[in-house]
Design a protein with these regions (language model features):
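Extracellular glycosylation-rich, acidic/polar low-complexity regions of adhesion-
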Residues: 1-167
Length: 167
């Protein structure tokens, strides 16, 4: 007699290029977020849905500056919702009832952005790790580097229009 038992396999998250570049805005305008990896893929040999995923700043975290976010779009991402913890640098994505499909998870992970809110950013690179969970097992982390480029902003002086006198 031969007995076969099903074995749950890990989901797999695969990133594309190893580095994404972020550059500080020139002047005093707001910095622009960059997509961390627009080509990231998610697979799972024995599941068509996943329960959750985390995207974490696992290297170089600057809690007062760094922000991870994602664009929630129910037509392409189902019921995936997210929350970011700035202290830990972790963006947690969840699917109520673990019903979001692999394609929906892939769309959500592809929409994750990094931004630095400082106009004097720490220029150390950030390591961003993607992990998917099928409800039982978590994938091995897939990591990306975000390089940080600061821009020297010219000082500004404002003329108040008043006359200055000296006595």
């Amino acid at each position: 007699t031969v007995s076969l038992a099903a074995v749950n396999t890990l989901p797999v998250v695969t990133d594309t290029t190893p580095t994404t570049a972020w550059t500080e805005a020139s002047g005093t305008g707001a910095n622009t977020p960059v997509v961390v990896d627009s080509g990231v893929t998610v697979t799972d040999a024995d599941n068509t849905t996943l329960a959750s995923a985390t995207v974490s700043i696992t290297g170089g975290l600057q809690p007062a500056e760094d922000v991870l976010a994602f664009t929630s779009n129910s037509s392409t991402m189902g019921n995936i919702a997210g929350s970011y913890n700035s202290t830990t640098g972790v963006l947690t994505l969840t699917s109520s009832g673990a019903t979001a499909t692999l394609a929906q998870w892939q769309a959500a992970l592809r929409s994750v952005t990094y931004n630095d809110t400082s106009h004097n950013p720490n220029t150390a690179s950030r390591t961003i790790s993607f992990v998917a969970n099928d409800g039982t097992l978590s994938s091995v982390a897939s990591t990306k580097t975000v390089s940080i480029t600061a821009v020297d902003t010219l000082p500004t002086m404002t003329d108040t229009g008043s006359t200055t006198s000296w006595t």
